[in-house]
Regions:
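Short, charged low-complexity linear motifs
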Residues: 1-2, 73
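Assembly/interface hotspot detector across virion components, adhesins/toxins, and nucleic-acid enzymes
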Residues: 10, 18-20, 26-27, 50-54
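Basic/aromatic-rich interaction segments and small domains that mediate binding to polyanionic partners
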Residues: 16, 21-43
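Short coil-to-beta transition motif at edge beta-strands of beta-rich domains
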Residues: 2-14
């Protein structure tokens, strides 16, 4: 069964949690996070496998954890260059 996606809603698409910004004939555009260290605006192929719809609260929590993980990694990398 194919999941219908809608602008403004959040979905798990592959390894990404994405809030959909727009959809065109080739891409699904949105802001999302992948695993624990990558986040940003992205374009996924229109035929990407949508696993499930995600609640906005789950999406926000996931983005927040990703942001914290990125900040921690950034601090760790900077500490390597401190005297």
């Amino acid at each position: 069964m194919k999941t219908t996606i809608e602008k403004g809603k959040c979905y798990e698409i592959g390894d990404w949690l994405v809030q959909i910004d727009s959809i065109d004939e080739h891409h699904i555009w949105g802001f999302g996070a992948d695993s624990d260290r990558v986040m940003g605006f992205l374009a996924l192929p229109i035929d990407s496998q949508v696993t499930r719809e995600v609640s906005i609260n789950d999406y926000i929590n996931y983005i927040d954890v990703t942001r914290q993980n990125i900040a921690a990694e950034f601090r760790e990398r900077l500490s390597q260059y401190e005297e």
